[in-house]
């Protein structure tokens, strides 16, 4: 039996990544080679060009080889280049993300014996267009033929609400990851979940707390004890030392979530090659002092997101926690005292996004072009149905095509629930192969229906696919536009075309007059105007292919549009 929906979801995180699969109405995290649910988003390349991904790569950060990197997600879609010293190779951020995605894909093949052809990949809600494009390219380079993107807060809400019996509720998704922060108000109502509003910061996360521990606590103590000239984080001379300090800070931060005190230790060489060994005791109170400004900053973003939609904290049922830092009790206490809303961490904050991505993947039909070739003599079916919805008697349809059949008069098709043995009864195909049927679905499980096709003589024929699935569950109504988009006019006014927060796709049509003179029959010249998206401006160039003039207005009849962001 081949898959008819994508089913696999990936959380491509700044510090850690994970992959999950939808099985029925439940999700399963696919463990990696180390038998862990999450894989560190770290990549190393040695002098022979061998690539390592995950914990082994992360361990090499401390080796001072210049051959391992982490947190490259923050630079997705930029021109930044990571240089691997031993091999001399240069890699872009999306190329390193490709290696992480390849590793997750290989984990599925090892654990399930299945080659994943398509997968939903999550992105922060605050990711811009160029960052999303870079993520798509990384997925394609990793071997995924289809990779729909899903915003991380939407994924988290789906993981919580897929099988929930919710009439109407507002949830606040609080996603404090390793390197990015997202806050989103979600509305769950009668089987649909959609984003009401969102905000975020692509440079706010657990890594910032780690670096603050390093710079506010560890560095001052080391400078008070040792003679370390120009001992700053930005000094390439001390790159190795600061990598060790950060790793120690991260470990100590995690330890302090369970105990009152922790010891931060490690060793590195000074400017003269002498080994320096540090042993620093850190109390939970000191950690809270360092971490609190970041938690307060994230809470202020949440409050702004609520106020923009005139929602009070009392209107929100719960805060859904996402991200490793939210596992710490002190973190939760500070957050709840700042927001005044109950917290929900019933689904593991480390894997909730991957699980939600898998749920969404179950709503995405697998593109037939990505499926295995149809065997000789078989019939193909282009299914047209929603794999997930709240209707217990959904409609399903499709079109049958065959190796040589053009007229399907006399053909019949029947759908059979493989578990309950419910049957649709034989449905006559139209002459062009089109059919429509009503299904009967059971709650609490993925309903699989065998497709039985019969020719005019009553002989059963093989089909691809040979099943379709339907699950009664919550669906994402629509994903929102991240930032408003509009055109800057010659009089310095701004004409908004598409509204932030509204569902996609959005379309808008405006008639504008150009201040640039255009002659009838003119071609080859360029019209330039400014497209604004949120706080980002872009230059748009329209290359004129053919123009015509009518009275006082100038019209561009045919144009080629290209966008270049500054």
Question: Which stretches of residues belong to each language-model region?
Answer:
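Conserved AMP-binding/adenylate-forming core of the ANL superfamily
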Residues: 88-99
